[in-house]
Amino acid sequence: MPSSTFSGTVSTPKLSVAVDMGNPFLNLTVDAFLKIGAVGVTKSLAEDTYKAIDKGSLSKSTLEHALKKLCKEGVYWGAAGGVYIGTEYGIERIRGSRDWKNAMLAGAATGAVLSAVGKKGKDTIVIDAILGGALATASQFVNNHYFY
């Protein structure tokens, strides 16, 4: 049975976390869940901090609501990141190449899955799939400097 390890290092201004689940697919998916989930938590924390400062008061119920929202946002964003990275890795393994087409297909699949889980209509699912594919493709182009 494969062993799992978790290690991390901190060096200014970079935080590095390595996850070894014994399988590349699981490694990438869990790593994406943790990193993108942290982005979701940070986003929610910034929003709630702004609201508390704008409102000018802080109560126990406000803190409880903020904590609950932090957890939900972290899981939602982490799940989205995990689905996207896992799907992109699977497509890469099937196609045997690593290019923008993988990002487009994975983005479309992730957009459709997240929309379907959100119990939206089928028109919205298609639109979210198109949006997910477009955003993932644009991100891939920017990251790989296809525009230069």
Swiss-Prot record:
**Species, as recorded:** Arabidopsis thaliana (Mouse-ear cress)
What triggers expression?
Answer: Transient reduction upon de-etiolation (illuminated 5-day-old etiolated seedlings) (at protein level). Strongly induced by low-temperature stress and weakly in response to osmotic stress, salicylic acid (SA) and exogenous abscisic acid (ABA) treatments.
The GO terms describing molecular function are: amino acid transmembrane transporter activity; mRNA binding; porin activity; protein domain specific binding; protein homodimerization activity
Q: Which UniProt keywords apply?
A: Chloroplast, Ion transport, Membrane, Plastid, Plastid outer membrane, Porin, Transmembrane, Transmembrane beta strand, Transmembrane helix, Transport
Q: Coiled-coil annotation: which residues?
A: none
What are the record's GO terms for cellular component?
chloroplast; chloroplast envelope; chloroplast outer membrane; etioplast membrane; peroxisome; plant-type vacuole; plastid; plastid outer membrane
Main function: Voltage-dependent high-conductance channel with a slight cation-selectivity; selective for amino acids but excludes triosephosphates or uncharged sugars. Non-essential amino acid-selective channel protein and translocation pore for NADPH:protochlorophyllide oxidoreductase A (PORA) and possibly PORB. Involved in PORA precursor (pPORA) import and thus confers photoprotection onto etiolated seedlings during greening.
Give the main location.
plastid
Q: Name a single GO biological process.
A: monoatomic ion transport
Q: Which family does it belong to?
A: Belongs to the Tim17/Tim22/Tim23 family. Plastid outer envelope porin OEP16 (TC 1.B.30) subfamily.
**Lipid bilayer topology:** Multi-pass membrane protein
Q: How is its activity regulated?
A: Stimulated by GTP.
Give the signal peptide as a residue range, or say none if absent.
Answer: none
* Phenotype on disruption: Strong red Pchlide fluorescence after 3.5-4 days of growth in the dark, and cell death after subsequent illumination. Conditional seedling lethal phenotype related to defects in import and assembly of NADPH:protochlorophyllide (Pchlide) oxidoreductase A; excess Pchlide accumulated in the dark operates as photosensitizer and provokes cell death during greening.
Quaternary organization: Homodimer and oligomers in membrane. Forms large complexes including TOC33, pPORA and OEP161 during pPORA import into plastids at the plastid envelope membrane.
Protein name from the UniProt record: Outer envelope pore protein 16-1, chloroplastic
Where do the TM regions start and end? 75-91, 102-118, 125-142
- Kindly list the places in or outside the cell where this protein is found, as annotated in its UniProt entry: Plastid, Chloroplast outer membrane; Plastid, Etioplast membrane
**Positions of disulphide bridges:** none
| Tissue/organ expression | Expressed predominantly in leaves and cotyledons.
Pfam family of the protein (one): Tim17
- In terms of superkingdom, the source organism counts as Eukaryota
